[in-house]
A protein has these predicted regions:
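Outer-membrane beta-barrel signature, preferentially recognizing the C-terminal barrel domain
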Residues: 352-378, 490-497, 554-567, 571, ...
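Transmembrane beta-barrel wall of Gram-negative outer-membrane proteins
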Residues: 45, 270-298, 308-344, 363-377, ...
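Gram-negative outer-membrane beta-barrel transporters
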Residues: 510-515, 526, 641-645, 659-741
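C-terminal beta-signal and adjacent terminal beta-strands/loops
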Residues: 644-647, 671, 726, 761-812
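Flexible loop and strand-edge segments within Gram-negative outer membrane beta-barrel domains
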Residues: 305-306, 310-312, 330-384, 391-415, ...
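Short acidic/polar hinge/loop motifs at secondary-structure boundaries
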Residues: 83, 175, 202-229, 660
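N-terminal periplasmic accessory domains that precede
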Residues: 114-118, 163-166, 181-186, 198, ...
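Short, acidic, small-residue-rich periplasmic hinge/interaction motif at the N-terminus
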Residues: 51, 62-64, 95-99, 109, ...
Length: 812
């Protein structure tokens, strides 16, 4: 569990950073409360319910937008409420995924107006939903960026094991494996350190060598996932050169009267005998709201068409809680807690280990607490002021059984020796502090400016122990002496990475909302420090410890470095007609090398991976040109993109102390370019054809070769249709071309295709309970294939085989 005393240790956290600048949270709270006093008396309100036009079902998650910044989201009872604004005539826009948006005018001429709305379902997703991935709310259709939204309804009907499984079918996104549980996402040829991953706006900062950050999230607690492809959002700073993944968890919503609700979900997968279950309880009234939820999953080894994938089992569970209060009108106070823990997680494929090694996470944990305060409707100019703090601990422990035995022949002066490496146990703790301030300012009609300051830091502490059994052999081969030795090493020095950034972004709609304009800038100061590090750190021989073992030396000197970087982005969306939009986004981005890239020293028996403290920051320039076409029965979203990088960080082959090594190096110039598209066509009644396609080419300009980790041309196509009322089926095929444009050391990958079938009902009411059932078959014909990105990382040569899945979701 999080130790509250750790949060307030001197020099270790953001609290002391704030105190050092003569501020504390009491002063902050007083400031926020004083600002709230300036809010003019605006006692008018509107409330009501949102329903489905055909069934009359109450619709949750519906956005009701009263004006540019004043909006709310309906709760699970379909209830919405907007308060404290002047009387007058307002344009109201109501939108929800899976429905046609509704725009109307409402006259607010009395203190409390009751107004219900009905929405008509749509077979085509028209992107009339709000997204917040650029730190400000805007309709997805109006975003100039290549942006994606995946909501909870899509997650509820899938068999996904991790966040990467949810995202892999989206255009421009591909899955990369270090295992079945441990996965990563590749966005247009960039992944891991080039992507910023957020949960509720808080960075998940940890090592990406053996993937885990996207696996430590309870999917049943996810409200939606927002993805920006490419370096279009500079306001997140270092690391966003490839894109942003922002996971928003479910938030308890307020209600005019007290409510108590619950939910339960359970699922089965045949391919690995997965059993999953989760539950939640939420309640509240007009003053407070809260929720608590938890999940449990257990899976055995995964079956592939070529046999069982050994050491691919896992078990995990999660717990989360949230409490929200409205202490004053237009004020909101939020608290959140999240715990995710995994045990006995097999890692069958990571490339840092020998091919016959047995590697697992004995335990893996992510724990986070956060608090936020915001004030809305402050004045006609200052719309909102918000502050948020989070503290996150990621605890990673690896156990590697390398099965390495070395025999040393006897000489004239020494006996024969048989040395076996019994196990290697790297472990690390990553502590993250994050503090954010943001002000939303209305400069004019359809012109909003945000100003903000954020600080985040990652503190790393780790150790690696190597357990050896050394046997001295007699001339006849018998053992006459045995030594059990434990060697302690530091894979990285104890180190810190700190970032302090100021950001600003202006969003404007011009010429009667024909042109949408976005300009964002960020200036960032980065501090990196590492302690002097000895290797070996110590040796223990038959229980006796030695802190000055033979061969001990300094592998990293104490280091402190800092740099100032800037980034910016410009986005335009032009509506040529009511149905046709053109978009353009350009940007300049940077990425300061991570702690692992600067200081890494991993020797797991197969080869050595080394960092370089003198690495330069990556700098990138990007451009994205988009074409979008919408009608009631057809949708086409497409983009072509180009990214050019300077001082790109990559691993190149080398040697270290006579061993084969991969060394982190600035390789010079590189470029990535390609396209992706997504289309839906409702060609007959409830039959909708959907297709995606993605292509990216990566060039190492300096070395005149190919970049590693580039997915081949790929896409999927399928038909979604209604079998009977409230039951929807989808049959699709995923297709990958061969990948022959490989980097040095990469395997070429043949092309393949496989087919999927899924069915999902809508929620149907039975008494007080609403239920939904989903099921399907993945990889119907048990196709044996290799994922190029998994092959380039490790030793998983065959992806999961045929999987029959079932899911049941209940709520009341």
């Amino acid at each position: 569990m999080i130790n509250i005393h750790e949060i307030f240790q001197p020099q270790e956290n953001i609290i002391h950073f704030v105190i050092a600048h003569k501020m504390n949270f009491k002063i902050l709270l007083r400031f926020l409360l004083s600002v709230s006093i300036e809010i003019s008396a605006q006692s008018y309100s509107i409330s009501g319910h949102i329903r489905d036009l055909k069934s009359g079902k109450l619709l949750d998650g519906t956005v009701v937008l009263l004006k540019n910044n004043l909006y709310t989201i309906s709760n699970t009872l379909g209830y919405y409420s907007l308060k404290d604004f002047p009387k007058g005539s307002y344009s109201v826009r109501i939108s929800r995924l899976g429905y046609k948006s509704l725009s109307t005018t409402v006259l607010i001429d009395k203190e409390s107006v009751k107004q219900d709305f009905v929405l008509e379902s749509s077979p085509i997703e028209l992107d009339e939903v709000l997204v917040n991935s650029s730190r400000t709310s805007k309709y997805l259709r109006n975003s100039p960026y290549s942006e994606l939204l995946i909501d909870k309804t899509q997650i509820e009907s899938q068999s996904s094991l991790s966040l990467s499984d949810v995202l892999k079918e989206q255009p421009g996104l591909s899955l990369s494996r270090d295992g079945i549980w441990g996965t990563e996402i590749n966005i247009r040829g960039l992944s891991r350190e080039n992507l910023v991953t957020l949960i509720d706006g808080n960075r998940i900062a940890t090592s990406t060598d053996v993937a885990a950050r996207l696996s430590m999230i309870d999917l049943d607690d996810v409200e939606r996932i927002e993805v920006i492809k490419g370096a279009s959002s500079s306001i997140y700073g270092s690391g966003a050169t490839g894109g942003i993944i922002n996971v928003i968890t479910k938030t308890p919503r307020f209600n005019e009267n007290f409510i108590l609700q619950g939910g339960f979900s359970s699922g089965l997968n045949s391919v690995n005998k997965l059993f999953s279950s989760s539950g939640s309880i939420a309640g509240g009234n007009s003053f407070w709201s809260s929720k608590i939820s938890g999940s449990f999953r257990k899976a055995g080894n995964t079956q592939t068409p070529s046999g069982e994938l050994k050491n691919s089992q896992f078990k995990d569970f999660s717990l989360s809680a949230a409490v929200n209060f409205i202490p004053l009108e237009n004020n909101l106070l939020k608290f959140n807690y999240q715990l995710f823990k995994a045990e006995d997680v097999g890692i069958p494929g990571a490339s840092v280990f020998p091919s016959d090694a047995e590697v697992r996470y004995p335990d893996e944990k992510r724990e986070m607490i956060s608090a936020g305060y915001e004030i809305q409707n402050i004045s006609k100019v200052f719309y909102k002021v918000s502050a948020k703090y989070s503290y996150q601990v990621i605890d990673r422990n690896v156990e590697n059984l390398p099965h390495i035995t070395q025999n040393v022949a006897a000489t004239d002066t020494t006996e024969a020796i048989r040395a076996a490496v019994l196990k290697i146990t790297p472990s690390s703790i990553h502590k993250n502090n994050n503090l954010q301030f943001q002000t939303d300012i209305i400069l004019g009609k359809n012109n909003n400016l945000i100003l903000g300051l954020d600080y985040w830091e990652r503190n790393y502490h780790g150790i690696r122990e190597k357990f050896q059994k050394i046997e001295t052999l007699a001339s006849d081969g018998s053992v006459f002496n045995t030594t059990i030795k434990v060697v302690g090493e530091k894979p990285l020095p104890d180190s810190k990475y700190k970032s302090l950034g100021f950001f600003a972004q202006d969003d404007a709609a011009l010429f009667d909302e024909i042109l949408f304009f976005t300009l964002g800038v960020r200036v960032e100061k980065i501090f990196v420090s590492g302690e002097s590090t000895l290797n070996p750190l110590y040796e223990i021989a038959n229980g006796k410890i030695n802190y000055t073992p033979k061969g001990q030396k300094v592998i990293w000197n104490k280091i402190k470095a800092d740099e100032i970087s800037d980034s910016w982005n410009l986005g335009l969306k032009y509506s040529c007609t009511e149905n046709l939009d053109l978009t353009l986004s350009i940007g300049y981005s940077f990425r300061s090398p991570s702690l692992e890239e600067r200081f890494q020293y991993i020797d797991q028996g197969s080869y050595v991976r080394l960092g370089d403290p003198t690495l330069k920051a990556e700098k990138g320039k990007s451009a994205d040109l988009g074409f979008r076409y919408y009608t009631s029965d057809f949708k086409l979203i497409s983009s072509i993109f180009y990214n050019r990088f300077k001082d790109l960080v990559a691993e190149i082959p080398g040697t270290f102390e006579g061993k084969h090594a991969f060394v982190k190096t600035n390789i010079g110039k590189a470029q990535l370019y390609g396209f992706d598209l997504h289309s839906e066509f409702n060609f007959l009644n409830n039959y909708t054809f959907h297709i995606t396609a993605s292509y990216v080419k990566g060039d190492d300009i300096t070395a005149k070769g190919n970049l590693p980790g580039i997915p081949p041309l790929n896409g999927n196509a399928g038909i979604k249709f209604t079998l009977v009322d409230y039951l929807v089926a989808d049959i699709s095929s995923t297709i990958f071309a061969q990948q022959n444009n490989t980097a040095t050391g990469e395997m070429k990958t043949p092309g393949y295709s496989y087919f999927n079938l899924s069915c999902a009902s809508t929620y149907n009411k039975f008494g007080l309970i609403e239920f939904q059932a989903a099921g399907g078959i993945e990889n119907i014909f048990n196709k044996d294939y290799r994922n190029h990105l998994s092959t380039s990382r490790g030793f998983i040569k065959s992806e999961p085989g045929r999987n029959i899945f079932l899911k049941l979701n209940l709520k009341w």
